[in-house]
Amino acid sequence: TGKVEELLISERKKSPLLFVLIDSEVSQIDSAVKLAKDVEQIGAASILVGGSSATDQMEMAEVVKNLKSAVNIPIILFPGNITGVVPQADAILFSSLMNSENPYYITQAQALGAPNVLKFGLEPLPTSYLVIGEGTSAWFVGNVRGIPFDKPKIAAAYSLAAQFFGMRFVYLEAGSGAKTNVTPEMVATVRKVFQGFLIVGGGIRDSQTAKSLTDAGADALVIGTLLEDSKNLEKLTEIAKAIKN
């Protein structure tokens, strides 16, 4: 395991973690940098950069470069495609979208992106990316056969397969701006079998929801869309407090 992975695991021993997703397409550089500094103050453990619809590589590289010099917490790439592999980040969620119906998103994009991960010196975090439900960008772009929200055992079976493949991270994704979040029941069911680092994202908008997910066994929560409205930093502060208690 590399430095970023070790850092996340040691931070997790203290309390569940908060990851903030900055979509390089939505954020202007200045506002991205300001947001990153704010969330670092609030207690975010990492900034994820990417998203399923982010395709402008130059723009993303520029955002990453600026974020890297602005904050001390790790910058982790979260690519929706090979264009999301850019230099200067600390690590990358090297993800297979395991419930895609298109092999491109399961292994082909990964093969095309891998040489650049090596070239740029990015620490790969081997991740099974599972999209829950349907109707979101990730679902549409990734040709996903969405795991139904009320079928936690299916998510657990995929997570177990991921573990047997040697993946140390599972990311349960309801999708950006999702109307509902992954259920605590699904998180608990996955947690029973998956021994690695469990990330949950999509539709998390308040501290109650956040707390229910970390209580169920999530190691980290990803907050993204909520922060596209800057007035919601207060909500993030509440979420950060709730999951630390």
Each model region followed by its residue ranges:
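N-terminal amphipathic alpha-helix/helix-capping segment at the start of soluble metabolic enzymes
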Residues: 1-22, 26, 113-127
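Active-site mouth loops of central-metabolism enzymes
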Residues: 16-32, 78-81, 131-156, 200-205
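Hydrophobic faces of well-ordered beta-strands that scaffold small-molecule active sites
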Residues: 18-22, 47-49, 75-77, 92-94, ...
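Glycine-rich phosphate-binding active-site loops on the catalytic face of alpha/beta enzymes
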Residues: 48-54, 91, 95-106, 174-177, ...
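Glycine/Thr-rich beta-alpha phosphate-binding loop at enzyme active sites
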Residues: 50, 141-187, 227-230, 235
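C-terminal helical cap(s) of enzyme catalytic domains, especially alpha/beta-barrels
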Residues: 63-68, 108-109, 225-245
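Catalytic cores of alpha/beta
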Residues: 77, 81-94, 189-223
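Conserved anion-binding
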Residues: 84-163, 244
